[in-house]
UniProtKB/Swiss-Prot annotation:
Name listed for the protein in its UniProt record: Elongation factor Tu, chloroplastic
GO molecular function per UniProt: GTP binding; GTPase activity; translation elongation factor activity
Family membership noted in the UniProt record: Belongs to the TRAFAC class translation factor GTPase superfamily. Classic translation factor GTPase family. EF-Tu/EF-1A subfamily.
E.C. numbers: 3.6.5.3
Annotated catalysed reactions: GTP + H2O = GDP + phosphate + H(+)
Region (G1), start-end ranges: 19-26
């Protein structure tokens, strides 16, 4: 019998649970899978399955993440949950598991705590666009007024980190009581148990409040140049993987980065020795360009839709500095440090001008294992945009991972 084909009937959204340690992120993840499994939209996963998350490597950094998938009536979700706080920080900065939205879990017994705030700040800086809040452990709060006060405090915290605190849905419940009810009776249907219903309610809010992301193919075309060669009598070919968008023969594209921006026309597209009319995100392709010499292009430039991305030299970034167990530095570094910044396909030297802590106070020293905000100035302009990921390298080894939070120049 032929294998069943993956049917893409529903739009796909990547989400994750974020929040302070022990507020119930993993319990909630398990409860969601069990609740949706009762409706036939998931394979139920136990807490221990999710908690013993396997190690993965992203940009040379080891991260523990658990991936679960489930479906609601409207969507297919991939959901990421990280067991440890350090894993969250690394995951958000490296973009190992991209998130289109997040479920912020806050314990009703504690309210917003330091990591709640840190995850919100990170979500804002790395571009997690939308958040829904689950106010957990509602059964431990005896007073309805206290719940209202907690909700106010959460909304104020959201506002502080530039999320729309007034609009964001806050659903209260108990992930543990829902999970216990579902473990006892995996067939629990909507209406059978008030705690399980709260999980369904949460997922309805996630369905309606977190917008379906724009697909990669609908974004403006961009391809980082990996290699260049010339074909006698035909012109110059740039090869690489299309990062987003699509490109057709006859399109005008810009060569951005390292030198002055140059405009050219696509005269041919090739993939696996076959010619194409159009190439889309994910394709490894050779693009034949009109009127461009081989010496005009080098690895590290990008080909992009005109006006969609600009060359920059100075930016602010959120960076995680690897500790020595992760293969990073053994010693601290200071403002003025000049490592290599590996962006897309190339290394560019840059100078780290200054470091700032979360509260914007200047810091003079950064230790391995720290997360820090830094201002970087590159020696050559390259195509940079907010939300872009990069690695920091020194002598060929990765010493940090970062994401651009603001463009300065």
């Amino acid at each position: 019998m032929a294998r069943e084909k993956f049917q893409r009937k529903k739009p796909h959204v990547n989400i994750g649970t974020i929040g302070h340690v022990d507020h119930g992120k993993t319990t909630l993840t398990a409860a969601i899978t069990m609740a949706l499994a009762a409706r036939g939209g998931a394979k139920g996963r136990k807490y221990d399955d999710i908690d013993s998350a396997p190690e993965e490597k992203a940009r040379g950094i080891t991260i523990n993440t658990a991936h679960v998938e489930y479906e609601t009536e409207n969507r297919h979700y991939a959901h990421v949950d990280c067991p440890g706080h350090a894993d969250y920080v690394k995951n958000m900065i490296t973009g190992a598991a991209q998130m289109d939205g997040g479920i912020l879990v806050v314990s009703g017994a504690d309210g917003p705590m330091p990591q709640t705030k840190e995850h919100l700040l990170l979500a804002k800086q790395v571009g997690v666009p939308n958040i829904v809040v689950f106010l957990n452990k509602e059964d431990q709060v005896d007073d309805a007024e206290l719940l209202e006060l907690l909700e106010l405090e959460i909304r104020e915290t959201l506002d502080k980190y530039e999320f729309p605190g007034d609009e964001i849905p806050i659903i209260s419940g108990s992930a543990l009581l829902a999970l216990e009810a579902l473990t006892e009776n995996p067939e629990t249907k909507p209406g059978d148990n008030k705690w399980v219903d709260k999980i369904y309610n949460l997922m309805d809010q996630v369905d309606s409040y977190i917008p379906t992301p724009e697909r990669e193919t609908e974004k403006p075309f961009l391809m980082a140049v990996e290699d260049v060669f010339s074909i006698t009598g035909r012109g110059t070919v740039a090869t690489g993987r299309v990062e987003r968008g699509c490109v057709k023969i006859g399109d005008t594209v810009e060569l951005v980065g390292l030198r002055d921006t140059k405009t050219t026309t696509v005269t041919g597209l090739e993939m696996f020795q076959k010619t194409l009319d159009e190439s889309v995100a994910g394709d490894n392709v050779g693009i034949l360009l009109r009127g461009v010499q081989k010496i005009d292009i080098e690895r590290g430039m990008v080909l992009a839709k005109p006006g969609s991305i600009l060359p920059h030299t100075k930016f602010e970034a959120q960076v995680y500095v690897l500790n020595k167990e992760e293969g990073g530095r053994h010693t601290p570094f200071f403002p003025g440090y000049r490592p290599q910044f590996y962006v897309r396909t190339t290394d560019v030297t840059g100078k780290i001008e200054s470091f700032r802590a979360d509260d914007n106070t200047a810091t003079q020293m950064v230790m391995p294992g720290d997360r820090i905000k830094m201002i970087v100035e590159l020696i050559q302009p390259i195509a940079i945009e907010k939300g872009m990921r990069f690695a920091i390298r020194e002598g060929g080894r990765t010493v940090g991972a970062g994401v651009v939070s603001t463009i300065v120049i």
